[in-house]
């Protein structure tokens, strides 16, 4: 299973990056049912609708630029998100590749029929939550002399 994406958000790169820095941060986006620290950077992330947690570890973190991770346990695979800031927004591009361990040649069939749409929906949920965050921020004020100051 391979999921690729390219999404733009009118949010600061630091804010968006904070949702992806470690697997423990993913619960803020994906409606996970909890996260457990397994030590050495590994986390078991419970996912709604899945019988087994996603056991993941960030393998490369460049703050504000890149996050790469790997899976182990029931799932095997990896993923990556690249962050490209521009004035007023950030572009996220990347992929997640995963498979069910122990199904061998049946894994692609099971992934296509049972898992891929669920994983896509999970990513879409995260994107919706970030877009909702954009809307909740509203217009920013700089605090300069043109701003109204009722205390003055």
What are these regions (language model features)?
Residues 1-39, 151-152:
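Hydrophobic ligand-binding cavity/cleft-lining segments
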Residues 1-8, 86, 95, 132, ...:
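Hydrophobic-ligand-binding modules of eukaryotic lipid transfer/binding families
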Residues 7, 26, 58, 69, ...:
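Polar/charged side chains located within well-ordered beta-strands of beta-rich proteins
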Residues 10-14, 59-64, 82-91:
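A short, structured loop/turn motif at beta-sheet edges
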Residues 17-19, 34-36, 62, 68, ...:
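Intrinsically disordered, low-complexity regions enriched in Ser/Pro/Gly/Gln/His and often acidic
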Residues 24-78, 87, 125-138, 149-150:
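Glycine-rich portal/gate segments that line the openings of hydrophobic small-molecule binding cavities
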Residues 71-125, 138-139, 143-144:
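Beta-strand/loop substructures that line and gate deep hydrophobic ligand-binding cavities in soluble
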């Amino acid at each position: 299973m391979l999921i690729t994406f390219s999404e733009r958000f009118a949010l600061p790169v630091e804010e968006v990056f904070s949702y992806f820095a470690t697997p423990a941060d993913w619960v803020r986006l994906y409606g996970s049912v909890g996260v457990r620290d397994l030590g050495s950077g590994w986390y078991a992330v419970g996912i709604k609708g899945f019988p087994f947690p996603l056991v993941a570890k960030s393998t490369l973190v460049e703050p504000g630029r890149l996050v790469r991770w790997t899976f182990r346990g029931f799932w095997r695979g990896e993923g990556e998100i690249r962050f490209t800031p521009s004035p007023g927004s950030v572009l996220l591009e990347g992929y997640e590749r995963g498979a069910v361990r122990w199904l061998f040649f049946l894994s692609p069939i099971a992934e296509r029929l049972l898992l891929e749409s669920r994983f896509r929906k999970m990513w879409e949920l995260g994107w919706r939550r970030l877009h909702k965050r954009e809307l909740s921020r509203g217009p920013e004020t700089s605090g300069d002399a043109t701003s109204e100051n009722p205390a003055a």
